[in-house]
Every structure is written in structure tokens, then in C-alpha cells.
């Protein structure tokens, strides 16, 4: 009988495959306002978070609340930022989509009012506010998808800092290893056809080939569920 394949071991949830979330610094969300329309804070530090590729700005607000937020391009320690409906339109400030002029790049956009921000949070990306009225705000995401959102959903003005990160090569396998380890991903990943028959359904043989159809049912047992899972079509003519 063969050994458990890597997909089965990952499903068990051991420390090798589990994300080290105890090292993550914060779950980013917009500051909630209860008694005031707008509040002011000062950037007191810029930090790195292993959970994400973008730098974080530590903000100290007037009410002595400290929190980490995504740092847009152009902000620095000592800058003043505002959160609220009457905030100035400048990078780092957070306000509802209804109060932001059309065409302004925004980041950390809420999907539903009060959820803290879900869209455009990776380094170097931004969404664009296309238009808004009393009932709906239309936002184009970095992928090109257009979303219709509640105009009271909040967003931060600017482009997320850290752009150009993907243009720098890893150079060494060790750098890639540490990057993947910070996110709880096993690296390097060995191809199934390069394994022995005991280790993978595609392993073994005198040459590297699957030796069986790669398409597999969605209901296949865990030890067989490898390859093209529940594929609608395969091959070079898949766009037809």
C-alpha cells in the first residue's frame, strides 16, 4: 500500500502546512467612529508584517488608540492622517466612497459597510472610483472587474506602498524558501511524475509521465485526487 501523498498530509493540518498566524501583527481594518465624524492621527512608525507584502503604518489617534493600517505610497513618519466623512482628499486618509471624487485611486476598499476593507490590499495596487451617486458607487478593481458597492463603504486614498516588489528576482532558492515559510507553504514542491510509484499516483516508470488520465472526479478519494480535478475541458483546444 502506498504512503499518504502530500495532499493528504496537508489536509491533516500539521505545523509544516499551517500558516504561522501567531507571528502576524494585525488584522487590518478601518478605524470605527462612534461619537465623531472625523478623527485625526499621526504616523509614528512604518513596520513589516510577515502576513503580507505591503508595509504597515502605525497610527496614533487623538483618542490614544493605536492601530496598524496599510501604508499608501508617499506617506512617512510624522505625517497627519484623517479618518471620517470630512477628511481631506490626500494619500493615507480614509473616508466613504460617496465623499471621494471620481477617478481617484483608492485601496483597502470595503465590500460591505463596516467590514474593515477587503479589496486592493496587495503591494503596489489600487482600485479606481469610476462613479457614484446616492445609491451605488462603481469601483474598478486591479483585476479589471467592476464592482457596484454601497456608497458608504470606506476606502483609503492612494496606492498601496511596496510597488515593484515582483520585479525583483529571488536570486537564491533560500530566499524563496523563507518567503514561502512565512506564509505556511511547503517549499520546494516536487512534481508527482518525478516521485516513486509509492509516493504519488503519477510516480514511477522508466520516464516521467503520469501513466493514466490526469482528469479526476471531484468525489475521488484523497489519495487519488491529483491532477486536473473536475476539469470541464483539457488540452490545447480548451479555449474553443
From Swiss-Prot:
Residues 1-12 have a biased composition (Basic residues). It comes from the Archaea. GO terms for biological process: cytoplasmic translation. The keyword Acetylation does not apply. InterPro entries: NA-bd_OB-fold, Rib_uL2_dom2, Ribosomal_uL2, Ribosomal_uL2_arc_euk, Ribosomal_uL2_C, Ribosomal_uL2_CS, Ribosomal_uL2_dom3, Ribosomal_uL2_RNA-bd_dom. GO terms for molecular function: rRNA binding; structural constituent of ribosome. Residues 221-231 have a biased composition (Basic and acidic residues). Keywords: Ribonucleoprotein, Ribosomal protein, RNA-binding, rRNA-binding. Pfam families: Ribosomal_L2, Ribosomal_L2_C. Belongs to the universal ribosomal protein uL2 family. This is Large ribosomal subunit protein uL2. The gene is rpl2.
Amino acid at each position: 500500500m502506498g504512503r499518504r501523498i502530500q495532499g493528504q498530509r496537508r489536509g491533516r493540518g500539521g505545523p509544516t502546512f499551517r500558516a504561522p498566524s501567531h507571528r502576524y501583527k494585525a488584522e487590518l481594518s478601518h478605524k470605527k467612529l462612534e461619537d465623531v465624524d472625523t478623527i485625526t492621527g499621526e504616523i509614528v512608525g512604518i513596520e513589516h508584517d510577515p502576513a503580507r507584502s505591503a508595509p504597515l503604518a502605525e497610527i496614533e489617534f487623538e483618542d490614544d488608540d493605536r492601530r496598524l493600517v496599510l501604508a499608501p505610497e508617499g506617506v512617512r513618519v510624522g505625517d497627519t492622517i484623517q479618518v471620517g466623512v470630512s477628511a481631506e482628499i490626500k494619500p493615507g486618509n480614509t473616508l466613504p466612497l460617496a465623499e471621494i471624487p471620481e477617478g481617484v485611486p483608492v485601496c483597502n476598499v470595503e465590500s460591505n459597510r463596516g467590514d474593515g476593507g477587503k479589496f486592493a490590499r496587495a503591494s503596489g495596487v489600487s482600485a479606481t472610483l469610476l462613479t457614484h451617486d446616492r445609491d451605488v458607487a462603481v469601483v474598478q478593481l486591479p483585476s479589471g472587474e467592476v464592482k457596484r458597492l454601497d456608497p458608504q463603504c470606506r476606502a483609503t486614498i492612494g496606492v498601496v506602498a511596496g510597488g515593484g516588489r515582483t520585479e525583483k528576482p529571488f536570486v537564491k532558492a533560500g530566499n524563496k524558501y523563507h518567503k514561502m515559510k512565512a506564509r505556511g507553504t511547503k517549499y520546494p514542491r516536487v512534481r508527482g511524475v518525478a516521485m516513486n510509484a509509492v509516493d504519488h499516483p503519477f510516480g514511477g516508470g522508466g520516464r516521467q509521465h503520469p501513466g493514466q488520465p490526469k482528469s479526476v472526479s471531484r468525489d475521488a478519494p484523497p489519495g487519488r485526487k491529483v491532477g486536473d480535478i473536475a476539469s470541464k475541458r483539457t488540452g490545447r483546444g480548451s479555449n474553443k
